[in-house]
Amino acid sequence: MDYHSPYFFGYLIGLIHLLGIIAALHAVFTVRTAQGAIAWALSLLFIPYFTLIPYLIFGARSFYAYIQARRQANQEMHVAMANLNWRPWVEEALTARESDSYAALRAMPKLGRMPCLANNEVKLLIDGEATFKAIFAAIEAARNTVLVQFFIIHDDTLGKQLQRLLLRKAAEGVQVFVLYDRVGSHALPGSYSQVLRDGGVQIQAFATRRGWFNRFQVNFRNHRKIVVVDGLRGFLGGHNVGDEYLGANPHLSPWRDTHVQIAGPVLACLQESFAEDWYWATRQLPPLILPDTYPENGVLCQALASGPADPQETCALFFLEAIHSATRRVWITSPYFIPDEAIFAALRLAVLRGVDVRVLIPSRPDHRIVYAASSLFAFEAVRAGVRMFRYQPGFLHQKVVLVDDEVSAIGSANLDNRSFRLNFEITLLTVDRAFADQVEQMLQSDFDQAREITAEDSRDTHRLQQLGMRIARLISPIL
């Protein structure tokens, strides 16, 4: 090709515009929200020079290859588990008890791919020391299988402690599987994984760029945090593996986070979620274990695994259903507050119904752009009657929802677009008065250590700061 030809740049410009038209049509048919489809289509039509590459990275909203992998994983699981017949046994033997509170969440049985199961033991783990003490104790007692999944694993003091423990269990003959997100754990050196592999631990990165059609899909993340030991003890919540989660970062310390420890039939669902992700990463299935018996009573639980491979926006719809079902209160804590229009409208409607609507967010930023966008949404929420609070002692990273007097949810999902549409998340929904009372006490303690945001805070914000907040909000759908 003659790059010096007077026609070369004309051909190049024409090609870019043609690709822009094709991408715009793709956006119209695939982007889930009307606002997003319009924004992408117009920008691709008129300024494709600047938007084609960002669209390849940020435009896709459905992880199509993972959908196919999930189908294959389910087929493989059905074959592998044919003798055990594990999931039908759980569903038939341990059906959910009658619950008016769960009945109020009318969409949940169909929204969640996993069943609501009774007779679970659930324990709150408040902050990092309690969380990792419980996780390490469970792994120490492992006899058969350990499944470990985190968004972030650091090669620091806590990370090395986990590494040594897993190596010791693998040397004892325990099957150990470790899955981490490639982007979230981008700072993890290859030597960390290699030491584990050399010691008999099966470790793999969850990467969304498998295959040619997914090579640009770097905007998806696997944000789940799951640990299951011998099918007897499970853990999920907000903590990752890093010293900062124990308060070692002076700029964010003390770190406020919440995990939950689980025993019971719902662990089958946590194992299923891990198995799907592991199958995507390795095309193999880990062993899935169920104990012979369960307690005769306990907490009603549903594991809600959500992500961009779902046929609908499971995470966003869960928040909507939870807020709409509230008759007395809905308390939410999240490190990021970037609701979409539907969630924001649901919060406003709950206020109009007389519901006590409270949202607790951090007073310190870990990501300044996200913090700026969250601040603007917080000011608008206050004007709508939502009570917004900033946690004062340190950084708040927990993801907790409390609805009325029985329903609570703890997991990895934030109240933002990334969790709604881009991340793979896991949340545990619980329906139990006694456990909800514990969650209430925990959150009330957090609110007692928070400062309520007022309308005056918005008026006192400098105009340049407000401009920065509005710019941050413009890009909030991809934050």
Swiss-Prot record:
List keywords of the entry alphabetically: Cell inner membrane, Cell membrane, Lipid biosynthesis, Lipid metabolism, Membrane, Phospholipid biosynthesis, Phospholipid metabolism, Repeat, Transferase, Transmembrane, Transmembrane helix
Broad class of the protein's primary localization = membrane
Instruction: State its location(s).
Output: Cell inner membrane
Q: What class of enzyme is it?
A: transferase
| CDD domains noted in UniProt | PLDc_PaCLS_like_1, PLDc_PaCLS_like_2
**Domain of life of the organism encoding this protein:** Bacteria
S-adenosyl-L-methionine is among the record's keywords: no
The record gives the membrane topology as: Multi-pass membrane protein
For the PLD phosphodiesterase domain, which residue ranges apply? Answer: 218-245, 392-419
**Could you tell me what this protein is called?**
Cardiolipin synthase A
| Originating organism | Pseudomonas entomophila (strain L48)
In the UniProt record, the gene name given for this protein reads clsA
